[in-house]
Amino acid sequence: MKVDDGLEEPAGSETWAAKPAELVGAAASDVDIDPVIHAQARLRIMATLAAVPVGDELHFPRLRELLDMTAGNLSTHLSKLEGAGYVQQNKTYAGRSPATYLALTPEGRVAFERYVRNLRSLLDA
């Protein structure tokens, strides 16, 4: 039998589709998933910046290229992350041209690690 998500129902399980919600239901109320990070674009930004070694920064155009996002969309999500204290933007000049470099703040790194840990515990429930 096929369910809406395209997965096969295991043999002998007539209530398979309801089981994930039952298993996760109790655990989900105990797990805090940060809504600032959880949005897809911001999660991709955080994951990319988390891969940058502490003390290093990523140039805005490189992040935009890696994530295949428009400059406006990336800027909007970076502003939200910066407002939460998760990302810092270092605006400077390279010659006469403005340049923006990005990095996770220490709080942002901790928040991302907590997010990953909480998501894993939710998925493992």
Question: Predicted regions span which residues?
Answer:
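Structural motif
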Residues: Q40-L43, A84, A99
